[in-house]
Amino acid sequence: MDQSQKEVWDDSELRNAFETALHEFKKYHSIEAKGGVSDPDSRLDGEKLISAARTEESISKLEEGEQMINQQTETTLEGDTHIQQFADNKGLSDEKPETRAAETHQEFMEVPPPIRGLTYDETYKKLIMSWYYAGYYTGLAEGLAKSEQRKD
């Protein structure tokens, strides 16, 4: 089975499958362009209820996490003040250790909140990767088309 390099690297089937998937995607996602659903709020009530339930669940999980972080931070700050007092050569400073610890604490607490409503399961990861590969092969196809046009 001696295959030439051209046969080995032939991705025409993959490109055809991608073009078919792209055509199908455009067909189903062009409903708004054809004037089908113009108001995004006119979706089914069931979808609204499900998304609201997921949002409430996410909010409650975030609040629980924030409470745990606050409790851990309080115990950490208490320990930090004792460490800072003994770490200083003099043992005392002009500034209170609680003030320094609070300033340090504020620097670390300015992390942006996570995006609500997302769950990172295997299906979601596969969806993200499929969009990545779709974009990659779209760019590849466009690049090849442009290079073929330049040759002509």
Curated annotation (Swiss-Prot):
It comes from the Eukaryota. The keyword RNA-binding applies. Its main location: nucleus. Keywords: mRNA processing, mRNA splicing, Nucleus, RNA-binding. The SMN complex catalyzes the assembly of small nuclear ribonucleoproteins (snRNPs), the building blocks of the spliceosome, and thereby plays an important role in the splicing of cellular pre-mRNAs. Most spliceosomal snRNPs contain a common set of Sm proteins smb1, smd1, smd2, smd3, sme1, smf1 and smg1 that assemble in a heptameric protein ring on the Sm site of the small nuclear RNA to form the core snRNP (Sm core). Homooligomer; may form homodimers and homotetramers. Part of the core SMN complex at least composed of smn1, yip11/gem2, gem6, gem7 and gem8. Part of the SMN-Sm complex. Interacts with yip11/gem2; the interaction is direct. Interacts with gem8; the interaction is direct. Interacts with proteins of the Sm complex, including smn1, smb1, smd1, smd2 and smd3. This is SMN complex subunit smn1. It comes from Schizosaccharomyces pombe (strain 972 / ATCC 24843) (Fission yeast).
